[in-house]
Amino acid sequence: KAASTRDKDFIEHVYVATNHQYMLFFTEQGRCFWMRVYEIPEGSRQSKGRAIQNLINLPQDDKVLAFINVLNLKDEDYINNHHIVMCTKKGVIKKTSLEAYSRPRVNGINAITIREGDTLLEAKLTNGEQDIMLAVRSGKAIRFPETKVRSMGRSASGVRAITVDHENDEVVGMIVVKEGDGFDVMVVSEAGYGKRSSLEDYRITNRGGKGVKTITVTEKTGELVSLKAVTDDDDLMIITKKGTMIRMGVNTLRVMGRATQGVRLINLRKGDEIASIAKVPASEEEEELLDAEGNVI
């Protein structure tokens, strides 16, 4: 056991880092904050950690949604050959050289100009040679080389990554992938259906298109809520809006065709739907299904 958690909480990210490496925190409103690893209070294996809001100068109306561990912000070769790629819920993507984030400021900086009615969704570290994949609620996904996104300054708002079908459609996830890296594509719908498909099923296209079908969205499946890059060494933590939580191994899911409906991952109570999906390191423990009070079902 690496840490204790509060009720309804679980460990989602685990980083191996030295004291002098940096953690970059990206917020919903498009700001970036820094912390040296040694500035994070050290705890025991049993401690529950500290709330991020107590460690960085985060406004009350903003929240952290992406974390990036950076090896060395003083290595010119490293910072000039890596990028931060961000996407918003409305399908805007932006790439900025890591060098632009190499001068930490206590109060953070603007990482992307967010347009009205939009919010930041994801931020990833890339090496300039990877592919970007996004999926939207209507069940479409697009894959394109990151070279199709030119590097921009921090004040820029970005360019179109995917064209959504209607104004209520939005991006649900972004992954950074490359052929041969061993990852499969995992999508989950709001009614608890999921599907693991091969990355090879998604042809590389140009940025800005409508994408291809990644899951057949029906009244039974509900709209798409999650996109993850997974391997057999991952677990999925599935959380519903009424408080049910289930953990399941990706290795229990077979690879299926891109346009299929998928399989039911969880039986939902009437009126319940999936709230969020997290990819976590595989557990050797048996999976447990918990109700809203935290009792094993």
Predicted regions, residues:
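Short, structured "edge-of-domain" segments at secondary-structure transitions
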Residues: 1-297
